[in-house]
Amino acid sequence: MKMFTLLYLLTVVPGILSDVQLQESGPGLVKPSQSIALTCTVTGISITTGNYRWSWIRQFPGNKLEWIGYIYYSAITSYNPSPKSRTTITRDTSKNQFFLEMNSLTAEDTATYYCAR
């Protein structure tokens, strides 16, 4: 089920919302025990548009993917149980952005982080 959800998040149906773009920004590197704050800016659609989940995923060295969590168009959040206690996803609808904050990072959090719809 997790793989299906991830594939769905990464799939864009041709011709539907094809002009939607997501751009991550934040610090390149952080040290263990520090926190990270990432921003995803969405263009081409409002993040309050119905029935969309705005997600954060990460890709570990070796290409393993992990879903971190999402914020629903209605601001409901859901998290992967693994990093849940250290993770917060929020949004700013006035800027059409959503955010990932993770605390108490360890070497095991080394990954490339992506936002996705």
Swiss-Prot record:
Keywords per UniProt: Adaptive immunity, Disulfide bond, Immunity, Immunoglobulin, Immunoglobulin domain, Signal
Disulfide bond sites: C40-C115
GO biological process: adaptive immune response
A Pfam family hit: V-set
Domain Ig-like per the UniProt entry, residue ranges: 19-117
Signal sequence range: 1-18
GO cellular component assignments: extracellular region; immunoglobulin complex
Name of the protein in its database record: Immunoglobulin heavy variable 3-5
Organism listed in the record: Mus musculus (Mouse)
